[in-house]
Amino acid sequence: MSKTQNHQKVILVGDGAVGSSYAYAMALQGTAEEFGIVDVVKERTEGDALDLFDATGFTFPKKIYAAEYSDCKDADLVVITAGAPQKPGETRLDLVNKNLKILSSIVKPVVESGFDGIFLVAANPVDILTYATWKFSGFPKEKVIGSGTSLDTARLRVAMTEMTGIKDPRSMHAYIMGEHGDSEFAAYSAATIGGRPFLDWAKEHGVSKEDLDKMEDDVRNKAYEIINKKGATFYGVAAALARISKAILRDENAVLPVSAYMEGQYGLNDIFIGTPAVVNGTGLHEVIEVPLNEEESKKMTESAATLKKVLTDGLKALEENK
């Protein structure tokens, strides 16, 4: 970590709905003693900083302020939420060209500040933008993490509580994997409840494959439902970012579903994709390769192929438009 354990610093880049929700979650959580906010709309960051600072009167002491890229120099963590929002009817992959351009204008000044901490990326399409952050920054792969399927996994676990009647989502050990987007899938074959395979529980309780497919599909499409109703999703992903941030800042060695770089895991290479991984103060410590069945392995391969094509096309377009 770049600062002492007793004083940790986070810089947020992007003060939109996701960014401000994340800032609030961090204020409530009490991790990081210093929190700076960078955005092109400087007045908004100043207002949010003042508002959030008021909240510390009820939570934890914290220095919160409108920051500049130069403030990243001694930060432990830079969190990127800036980007064009996903509109109704638009997929996350549709955002790639717009947000690659925005991202390139962010990563350069962060790195030029002397920043030597960890990047956490949440802007969509997150797997592609995490890869691009790694490429643009020149950082070691371990120091670049995407929020990946963390929110999707939470949605699956919540859905499983409704199906099983077991009310605590933390009792559900199951993961959504692959792209954070339309090609993601539920790794049901590796899911457990209290150590028991979830598929055994489902069979015993008369849950059909159609029921499981519907739950997976509902999870996959939940973001679209929320976007159609209120214009954007932000509370869920903000909570996910706060959880990942805590694992980094508290050096937890926690297993979390994130977007991680592949070096042979699942037969994949040179791609960031959603998988459980060990997250700690050094960043992404280790990928946990989930044992997938044949159908799930095929889905993981297809999801990676989808991402790689869009990534290649997006980076090529960015280079041509320079």
Curated annotation (Swiss-Prot):
Q: For this UniProt entry, what is the primary localization, expressed as one broad class?
A: cytoplasm
Q: Where does beta-D-fructose 1,6-bisphosphate bind?
A: 157, 173
Signal sequence extent: none
What EC number(s) are associated with this protein in UniProt?
1.1.1.27
Q: Which PROSITE patterns match?
A: L_LDH (PS00064)
Q: Which residues of this protein are catalytic? A: 180 (proton acceptor)
Q: What are the Phosphotyrosine sites (modified residues) in this protein?
A: 224
Cite the annotated pathway.
Answer: Fermentation; pyruvate fermentation to lactate; (S)-lactate from pyruvate: step 1/1
Q: Mind listing the UniProt keywords for this protein, alphabetically?
A: Allosteric enzyme, Cytoplasm, NAD, Oxidoreductase, Phosphoprotein
Binding annotation for substrate = 86, 92, 124-127, 152-155, 233
Question: Where does the protein end up?
Answer: Cytoplasm
Q: Name one GO molecular function term.
A: L-lactate dehydrogenase activity
| Activity regulation field | Allosterically activated by fructose 1,6-bisphosphate (FBP).
Binding residue positions for NAD(+):
18, 39, 44, 69, 83-84, 105, 122-124, 147
Q: What class of enzyme is it?
A: oxidoreductase
**Reaction(s) this enzyme catalyzes, per UniProt:** (S)-lactate + NAD(+) = pyruvate + NADH + H(+)
Q: Name one GO biological process term.
A: lactate metabolic process
CDD domains documented for this protein? HicDH_like (cd05291)
What does UniProt give as GO cellular component?
cytoplasm
Known function = Catalyzes the conversion of lactate to pyruvate.
Partners and quaternary state? Homotetramer.
PANTHER family hit by this protein:
L-2-HYDROXYCARBOXYLATE DEHYDROGENASE (NAD(P)(+)), L-LACTATE DEHYDROGENASE
Give the record's family classification: Belongs to the LDH/MDH superfamily. LDH family.
Q: Which NCBIfam families match?
A: L-LDH-NAD, PRK00066.1
Q: What protein does this entry describe?
A: L-lactate dehydrogenase
Q: Which gene encodes it?
A: ldh
